[in-house]
């Protein structure tokens, strides 16, 4: 049976997403954009921003995989008791 996601859980997840997005945007912007003498985004700034985003996505994917591996190991080590 699939668990229902409540509206408050959805709001919480969305707030977490926005917080992560804002933090990522700020970090990549601060690292990559150095010249404010033109309105145009320079090619090196674009490349840097794309690399920053890719690095973040790879890092979060790796952490997620390790987290799943850890939980699998824990479940194998300590099996769940059956409900009677």
UniProtKB/Swiss-Prot annotation:
UniProt GO cellular component terms: mitochondrial inner membrane
Keywords for the protein's UniProt record, in alphabetical order: Chaperone, Disulfide bond, Membrane, Metal-binding, Mitochondrion, Mitochondrion inner membrane, Protein transport, Translocation, Transport, Zinc
Motif Twin CX3C motif, chain ranges: 28-52
Signal peptide (residue range): none
GO biological process terms on file: protein transport
Molecular functions (GO terms): metal ion binding
Disulfide bridge map: 28-52, 32-48
Cellular compartment(s): Mitochondrion inner membrane
Membrane topology: Peripheral membrane protein
Subunit and partners: Heterohexamer; composed of 3 copies of TIMM9 and 3 copies of TIMM10/TIM10A, named soluble 70 kDa complex. The complex forms a 6-bladed alpha-propeller structure and associates with the TIMM22 component of the TIM22 complex. Interacts with multi-pass transmembrane proteins in transit.
Function according to Swiss-Prot or TrEMBL: Mitochondrial intermembrane chaperone that participates in the import and insertion of multi-pass transmembrane proteins into the mitochondrial inner membrane. May also be required for the transfer of beta-barrel precursors from the TOM complex to the sorting and assembly machinery (SAM complex) of the outer membrane. Acts as a chaperone-like protein that protects the hydrophobic precursors from aggregation and guide them through the mitochondrial intermembrane space.
Family note: Belongs to the small Tim family.
Domain free text: The twin CX3C motif contains 4 conserved Cys residues that form 2 disulfide bonds in the mitochondrial intermembrane space. However, during the transit of TIMM9 from cytoplasm into mitochondrion, the Cys residues probably coordinate zinc, thereby preventing folding and allowing its transfer across mitochondrial outer membrane.
Protein name in the entry: Mitochondrial import inner membrane translocase subunit Tim9
Primary gene name: timm9
């Amino acid at each position: 049976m699939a668990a229902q996601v409540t509206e408050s859980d959805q709001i919480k997840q969305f707030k977490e997403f926005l917080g992560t997005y804002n933090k990522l945007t700020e970090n990549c912007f601060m690292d990559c954009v150095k010249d404010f003498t033109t309105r145009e985004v320079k090619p090196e700034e674009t490349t840097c921003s794309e690399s920053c985003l890719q690095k973040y996505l790879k890092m979060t994917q790796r952490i997620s995989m390790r987290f799943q591996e850890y939980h699998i190991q824990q479940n194998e080590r300590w099996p769940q008791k059956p409900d009677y």
